[in-house]
Regions:
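Extended, low-polarity transmembrane helix blocks
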Residues: 276-349, 366-450
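Membrane-interface interhelical connector segments
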Residues: 348-366
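N-terminal Rossmann NAD(P)H-binding glycine-rich loop of SDR-like oxidoreductase domains
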Residues: 22-43
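NAD(P)H-binding glycine-rich loop region in Rossmannoid oxidoreductase-like domains
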Residues: 56, 62-113, 117, 132-136
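Conserved beta-loop-beta element that borders a ligand/cofactor-binding pocket
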Residues: 151-172, 181
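Substrate-positioning beta->alpha
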Residues: 113, 174-175, 193-215, 222-225
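Mid/C-terminal beta-alpha module of Rossmann-like enzyme folds, strongest
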Residues: 13-14, 213-275, 289-327
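SDR active-site strand-loop-helix element
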Residues: 26, 50, 91-92, 126-131, ...
Length: 450
């Protein structure tokens, strides 16, 4: 929904003031912040990028400063940062609480302190990036915390825009990666059949809106819903993304809500999962908005979902989307091979025959037992580590080394295995290739997260 302050008109700056401004963008290293910074730079503004940790390499035309929202909880903490700043844009946000970062601190306390400091410093304009759904009907901790900061800003005597974006689609956005990945799956289970309503907006429309608002001087606070031109069901959204990636129509089935809730509970324990009980509840809310105000300030209609993916970029989107679920599937498969191999060696396969094979490579007695059970435990350890380790480069290297070691030993002592109809040695070749592929993908595309 869209709400406005008592004054609903935005007056442009006088002609002699319509010039580049000094803009502080907080959360500048996040998805929204990065794109906002680029858009403002293209417009000729002087940008100060507020980041939690200074980057190792920086843009020569951007001033970087450390701004930690977990510590800036009082207005006086922000006053030095605001010296010489004309516009403040708060793009800090998180979808899940983690590592000491909470909704209460990052979405409510720190922004409230920042906004009060902006009033004291007489900052010319504040743009708060909130969220669609941060309204009177808000129920989730995420939306309630966003609404609390918005409400503080509305009480202050300072020109401000509160932007409430819907689901934002962009090439490096986590939600875009998630939904394109889901859309690329051969068959997609959708909670309740995917009837939930979404109104996704493209990142380029959000940044274009910020560009249009930055030179303005509104009287009071104006709240603008930022969404796409039409509401779509979850099923329609994923189907459109799939077709734009050149994968044909979506094949989906209805996932019972009980199973969806169980999956969300499981996702709660996975640090990188976007599916949690709270995000599932937010999805079920079916959040949509009237975008009349957005059209007014943007001067055009926002981009429809059917045009989100540039045809020239469809191949790249498709490859990354497929890797999104194929990579963890490959990793799970390799983990199963290691674990099952270890369990087989522990006794599922006749121990006497295992000892007979070890005798062929010159191991008998105690040495054979140590080799058999030691290798079995190593295999199981490899499998568990494959599933749970976050940084796996060394693990992949160790696995390749062990497989090559097994292969060389057996090739020397039992070369007939190369001609065995079940291919016990030949199968090592694709195994090594897959492990190397995963190691390369994780290094080049950052796919190492669980």
């Amino acid at each position: 929904m869209t709400s406005r302050a008592s004054s609903t008109t935005a007056a442009p700056l006088p002609e002699n003031m319509a010039k580049p401004r000094t803009v502080l963008v907080l959360g500048a290293n996040g998805f929204l912040g990065r794109h906002i910074v680029s858009a403002l730079m293209a417009q000729g503004h002087s940008v100060i990028a507020g980041v939690r940790k200074l980057p190792a390499s920086s843009h020569p035309d951007i001033t970087y400063i450390e701004t930690d929202f977990t510590k800036g909880l009082a207005p006086q903490d922000w006053l030095p940062v605001l010296e010489g700043v004309d516009v403040v844009i708060n793009a800090v946000g998180l979808l899940r609480e983690h590592d000491g970062q909470t909704f209460d601190t990052l979405h409510e306390q720190a922004p409230a302190a920042l906004f009060r400091a902006c009033q004291q410093s007489q900052v010319g304009l504040v743009i708060q990036i909130s969220a669609l759904g941060a309204d009177e009907a808000a129920a989730s901790a995420y939306h309630l915390s966003k609404k609390a900061a918005d409400d503080v800003l509305r009480t202050l005597d300072i020109p401000a825009f509160i932007l409430q974006p819907s689901l934002v689609f962009g090439p490096d956005g986590s939600s875009a990666r998630l939904f394109t990945m889901l859309a690329s799956m051969p068959v997609l289970p959708l909670p309740g059949g995917g009837c939930q309503l979404l109104q996704p907006v493209h990142i380029h429309d959000l940044t274009a809106l910020v560009q249009a608002l930055t030179p303005l001087n509104p009287a009071g606070t104006i709240t603008i819903a930022v969404a796409g031109p039409q509401a779509l069901t979850l099923r329609e959204y994923t189907d459109l993304l799939r077709r734009q990636m050149g994968l044909g129509p979506l094949r989906a089935f209805s996932l019972h809500r009980i199973l969806a809730k169980l999956a969300a509970q499981a996702g709660q324990w996975m640090s990188s999962s976007l599916l949690t009980p709270e995000t599932l509840a937010m999805l079920e809310r079916s959040n949509t908005a009237d975008i009349e105000d957005m059209r007014f300030f943007l001067g055009r209609d926002p981009t429809p979902v059917a045009s989100f993916i540039n045809p020239a970029e469809a191949d790249g989107w498709r490859a990354l989307a497929l890797l999104g679920w194929l990579q963890p599937l490959l990793r799970f498969s390799i983990a199963v091979v290691w674990i099952v191999t270890g369990l087989v060696s522990l006794g599922l396969y006749p121990v006497e025959e295992s000892y007979a094979l070890l005798a062929e490579v010159g191991l008998e007695g105690t040495a054979a037992s140590v080799a058999l059970y030691g290798a079995a435990l190593l295999d199981i350890g490899f499998g568990i580590a494959t599933l749970w380790l976050r940084k796996r480069r060394l693990l992949w290297q160790m696995q390749i080394a062990v497989i090559l070691g097994y292969t060389l030993i057996l090739s020397w002592f039992i070369p007939a295995f190369w001609l065995h109809p079940f291919g016990p040695l030949l199968k090592n070749l694709p195994m090594v290739a897959l492990i190397y592929l995963l190691m390369t993908l994780e290094r080049q595309h950052g796919l190492s997260r669980r």
